[in-house]
Curated annotation (Swiss-Prot):
Protein name (Swiss-Prot/TrEMBL): Ribosomal RNA small subunit methyltransferase H
One Gene Ontology MF term: rRNA (cytosine-N4-)-methyltransferase activity
Cell location: Cytoplasm
Superkingdom: Bacteria
InterPro entries tied to this protein: RsmH, SAM-dep_MeTrfase_MraW_recog, SAM-dependent_MTases_sf
Length: 321
């Protein structure tokens, strides 16, 4: 059985499993953080390569991921029910600030979340319109759509979904809910209900993409503050990581990848220094906090054939200086 199959969960094929873990340049006695436990594919592979003195802290805000993580009975492993933006606080709690040898982040929604209709992430399966990563906190998608203004909704769809028909779709959603309230009927509260409304609002269809794809993505990203969380954890990695500590990040859409790419590029170039200052090369280099490791990595044709959802994945790796 291949390593990829051994460590992936039956319900979830971990994307870029070997590549992301290899990017951490594991030390047998190192301290590592899996910021997105999911169903544990990356965590299990990391644990298999650590000595008895190694340590792995996993983080996830999905209650079902916590249930899965608690099945791992290993003294080197612990799970934290939290967002990965809380990694600095978690490290401070255990006295690990500046001592972590690697952080792995596998962004976006997992296959079990997509495949579970009750989570409300998929426009292909009928379920409650929820979309929260942590179902114990915040507004569901249905609750938020019932109170958001047309203008704000259009902004969310355009900003986080890059949806060209954002205004049309926002108007259709807000008008539907407004009419439902006036008629004392149910507001939008099912995934297929929303998907069908979006399809009817879009003037023409992209034959390669479902009309609801970008809208569902935008609402999910906004409700879960995904880009804010990502920006926070990227910045905190500079403090949490030890010198030569690695940051290995898998993203699944252009907004995430753009943010990761720009962050790593900026930190590897250092601060802009005005021309003409009498500085030596080593003084200029001090402003750099990271160095990028290799080029961006994408799944092989073989991996995409086995797991089509991996097609859009991009892995970027950097090392703290």
């Amino acid at each position: 059985m291949s390593e990829r199959n051994t460590f992936s969960h039956p319900e979830h094929t971990t994307v870029l499993l070997h590549e992301a873990v290899q990017g951490l340049a594991l030390k047998e006695q190192g301290i590592y953080i899996d910021g997105t436990f999911g169903r544990g594919g990356h965590s299990r592979l990391i644990l298999s390569r650590l000595s008895p003195n190694g340590r792995l802290i996993a983080v996830d805000r999905d209650p079902l991921a916590i249930v899965e993580a608690e099945k791992i009975q290993d003294p080197r492993f612990q799970i934290e029910h939290n967002s990965f933006s809380a990694i600095p606080e978690i490290c401070a709690k255990y006295g690990l600030t500046g001592k972590v040898d690697g952080i792995l982040l596998d962004l976006g929604v997992s296959s079990p979340q997509l495949d579970d209709a009750q989570r409300g992430f998929s426009f292909m399966k009928d379920g409650p319109l929820d979309m929260r990563m942590d179902t114990t906190k915040g507004l569901s998608a249905s609750e938020w759509l019932a109170q958001v203004s047309e203008r704000d909704l259009a902004w969310v769809l355009k900003t986080f979904g890059e949806e060209r028909f954002a205004k049309r779709i926002a108007a259709a959603i807000v008008n539907y809910n407004k009419s439902a309230v006036e008629k004392n009927e149910e507001i939008l509260n099912r995934t297929l209900q929303l998907a069908e409304l979006i399809s009817s609002a879009v003037p023409f269809k992209d034959k390669h993409k479902h009309p609801a794809t970008r809208t569902f993505q935008a609402i999910r990203i906004f409700l879960n503050s995904e880009l804010d969380e990502l920006e926070s954890v990227l910045q905190s990695a500079l403090t949490v990581l030890a010198p030569q500590g690695r940051l290995s990040v898998i993203s699944f859409h252009s907004l995430e990848d753009r943010m990761v790419k720009h962050f790593m590029r900026k930190q590897s170039r250092g601060e802009d220094i005005p021309k003409g200052l009498p500085l030596r090369e080593e003084q200029i280099q001090r402003n750099r906090t990271l160095k990028t490791i290799g080029k961006a990595i994408q799944p092989s044709e073989r991996e995409i054939a086995v797991n089509p959802r991996s097609r859009s994945a991009v892995l970027r790796i950097a090392e703290k200086l």
